[in-house]
Amino acid sequence: MSSAPTPHVAWFRLFQRGQIYMKTWPNEKRLAPVFPENRVTRATRFAIRFMPPIAMFTLCWQIALGGQLGPAIATALFACSLPMQGLWWLGKRAVTPLPPTLLQWFHQLRDKLQASGIALAPVDGAPTYQSLAELLRRCCKQLDKTFLDDI
């Protein structure tokens, strides 16, 4: 789905980048039809909060009712892996370079911010989805919501 190959990032570092990306992405309803991040972050937050207790409950429940240990452990491991899958996806997405259409919109947003007198740091290399998330967060705080009309 991405236009260019993503740079190699260490496995554990992807989870950290996923957490940072999840915290950075603005929770703006008008972005939801265009970007899947709103749905993925909501599902990942839910999974981080509720899946470990659900895993423990199902594990204890199956063992208490005399079930086999193998399927009980497999179910618990699957439930615990769901938040990790969300963070991994968000981490991969954070380091993915922007496709050409979003790249153009990214530069338009940067120009709007600079035209309104807001200082921005220069972009290092090719902009990624993390760069877009930081820019969108800044635009949501400092510009009116009409910048979302260009999506």
Curated annotation (Swiss-Prot):
InterPro entries: UPF0208. Its main location: membrane. It is found in: Cell inner membrane. Pfam families: DUF412. The keyword Cell membrane applies. GO terms for cellular component: plasma membrane. The chain crosses the membrane at residues 46-65, 69-91. It is a multi-pass membrane protein. This is UPF0208 membrane protein NT01EI_2692.
